[in-house]
Regions:
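Charge-rich, intrinsically disordered N-terminal extensions
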Residues: 1-151
Length: 151
């Protein structure tokens, strides 16, 4: 849809412009934005198929966002997707959500929650990232030990 393409074009500018007063952090390269946009399109397609929600970035303003993201992550895990990939998907959704929070009028219901849907989305990302971190921690410790004693 043209409206969604326009929203995603605005997201691209938001993330890639070297100077942007609304954005925390530095700009990113086009490939990063492309990944975020592809992830968002997959998520919006899943929302349309499972909840009959019209695709658009406005869903990121909704109080139910983190519930939908959790269901989506579980669906991806059930399909056998690795947690590292799910963490990347959730990170892309979190980046788009941050853009929406900076540039859209977020639902009052979402803002009144003890933790915002964005906060909960970031928690989900950390939870699927944690198993990978636990798996790699011994290896990273061994690499650090070797590097430390090699000096």
């Amino acid at each position: 849809p043209a409206a969604l393409n326009s929203e995603l074009d605005k997201y691209t500018l938001y993330r890639t412009e070297p100077l942007n007063r609304e954005r925390d952090g530095s700009c990113v390269v086009d490939i990063t934005v492309g990944s975020d946009k592809a992830t968002t399109l997959r998520f919006l397609g899943w929302l349309k198929a499972t909840h009959d929600i019209v695709p658009g970035l406005g869903v990121f303003c909704r109080a139910a966002l983190s519930q939908w993201a959790e269901q989506y992550a579980k669906a991806l895990a059930d399909k056998g997707l690795k947690y590292s990939s799910i963490a990347n998907y959730l990170n892309g959704l979190a980046m788009v959500c941050q853009f929406v929070y900076q540039t859209y009028a977020v639902d009052a219901e979402a803002l009144a929650m003890p933790t915002t849907p964005l906060d909960e989305l970031l928690r989900l990302r950390g939870q699927v990232h944690s198993p990978l971190y636990r798996l790699l921690s011994p290896l990273l410790a061994e690499v650090a030990r070797v590097l430390f004693f090699a000096v």
